[in-house]
Amino acid sequence: MKYKMLMLYCLLQIISMSALAQDHLNIKSIFDKYGKQEGSVLVQLSSDILSQGSNITFYKSLIMSNDVAKERDVLNLLKLDIDKNVIVSEVKKNGKVESGTYYVGKDKSGKTGEYILYKNKPDKITIVYLKGNFPPARLDSELKKLKDLFIYVNDKRLKIQ
């Protein structure tokens, strides 16, 4: 009985830690608002998949159709989150952010770095939130590891791109 209670407690801790990820960031409302809309693709990778050779501990992405209201909404909240933090890279065209990689600091535990990736194409907007135990200088190498990660679904190999 004690073993079952201990396992239940551990499971609840893991669930609550995942639920708290990105709660303090403004960009969270974008995932909540647009993540379940028709045509949007929301992906969250579990830690058991991410632990295969990567230091990324949490991954959540949203791909949604692009329109002026969504773009304005995303950029306003993104500016609030990256204020006084590190811009790892940013590409602007005609004064408009087309893509960006941002380090938004450590999470509440103070151990894990948080990152937001943003890409704006004419037909879609992509936002990625991730956490990991690595400095901003190693983000590119961690993303390459993630890109090479294979997910097996119904005995088929799907490569993340």
Where are these regions (language model features)?
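Amphipathic, non-transmembrane alpha-helical stretches in extra-cytosolic proteins
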Residues: 79-82, 86, 125, 151-153, ...
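Short, surface-exposed beta-edge/turn micro-motifs
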Residues: 56-61, 99-100, 112-115, 123-125
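Extracytoplasmic
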Residues: 40, 46, 83, 96-97, ...
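Mid-chain, structured segments of secreted extracytoplasmic proteins
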Residues: 66-110
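Early exported N-terminus immediately downstream of N-terminal targeting peptides
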Residues: 24-78
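A short, solvent-exposed beta-edge/loop patch
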Residues: 105-139
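Bacterial Sec-dependent N-terminal signal peptides
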Residues: 1-27
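C-terminal partner/receptor-binding element of secreted or periplasmic proteins
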Residues: 132-161
